[in-house]
């Protein structure tokens, strides 16, 4: 493992020693604690499903406890994006995939350029489909990849790691802070090294997983919920939603075109033919609404 001197100091403060293990009384990896569900292979399908669901019901409460920190982060993001800043999600494994997923949904849902919210995963695109060996253990690679995107202090970096100990993520956040970039983290262990290098740490404590150590489960579910909350709230505050409708969505298939037509019918109280024509002329629901209200009329075919 390549490790900067500063990153090594972080690990020392947190009790990190040889072999990347922790022996500090101040840091307990809840994500590695034994499951309360035992002898899983002896349970029926129904018992397994109910057990998983029982654990999943704990996630929403854990996320709710994080709302004050999420609110702080969203306010900072909105301010920076108004000034041309971008959101960067950075993670490895499931955490990285969830960041890439959330970023990929922003253009079609809210009509924003794909450069506004960027997801980066350790190991690159191939890691979206299969594990890339040792990718998360390189503490310098994350920052190098952020530099490829010309990250600046206008941007926001959100590091995602259930354990809070992923070198790829910690190293990137530490370097970002050194360059005056706002950093946030999402983890499932309190007092982790990742939290210590984040300006806004979000610690979502979901407890031990149904299968011991399988953080793709509750931790992954909670990460997805928090990412949904962040990106959705930011886009609403940036004016990308009207009422409760996705008026800036990309009209990329028949379903979305039909949805756009119905939005215009509901909002403007016009008939389906008029709505279709208006949408075709303007190219988006938002532009159609603005054009109609500006002109207070619609061009009709004779």
Residue ranges and their predicted role:
Residues 1-14:
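Single conserved hydrophobic/aromatic residue that forms the stacking wall/gate
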Residues 24-62:
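Cofactor-/ligand-binding subdomain signature composed of acidic, glycine-rich
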Residues 55-65, 131, 156-159:
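Short, basic, glycine/proline-bearing loop/turn elements
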Residues 65-80:
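A short, well-structured juxtamembrane/interface segment
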Residues 82-83, 178:
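Residues at the C-terminal ends
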Residues 88, 92-225, 234-238:
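Glycine-rich phosphate-binding loops that contact phosphosugars or nucleotide phosphates
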Residues 234-302:
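Short, amphipathic alpha-helical interaction segments embedded in low-complexity terminal/linker regions
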